[in-house]
Amino acid sequence: MDSLTIFREIIRRNELGGDLSHAYRFSDPDGVRSGKSGWSFGLCQFDVANNPSAVLCLRECQFTTDEILGLKRQDVDIVPLNRKLACNTRTVDRWDDRQLFECLTHASEVCRASGIRFASDEVLFHLADYHNQFYLSRGGKMHQFLLGVGRPVTAQDILIFKLGLAWGKKRPDDVHRRFSNIRNVWVENFA
């Protein structure tokens, strides 16, 4: 199985709890309409407020500027917009595929350019999942952590880093769930 197909399955489990039907309706990423994020959609859970690709995808799906602003602010009637999104599954899938490919490519390129090696190919999927959630920036916290490991990076190293984040301290169960999903998909395809 190719890396993109494997990563698609990882993201399906991590972002949608395994239920692909959730990709075609809007969800509140933090569950409390905190204002930190807008509504999210797609397999990759594009955050309308923080991901420019989300807006481009919605424009291609014929969402109006007012609808997109309402999704960003989370102050719009979501029911008709869910119907509109569900009519554009092929467009959403195409943007998801771009995002998945970009996550794998970006994580690989950042590490390769910095001389960071992986103890196994599984590590790339953990980093790509991190990138889909947070963005793996050159010189950022994760990148600095990886540079400091001083040996080939393991999946366990990524887990330890994530558990040290505010999200990891607040939701260690979610960090472990995501880690287990990645590990399980990896084992299902390569064991």
Language model features with spans:
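Cell-wall polysaccharide-cleaving catalytic domain and substrate-binding groove, primarily
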Residues: 1-117, 122-191
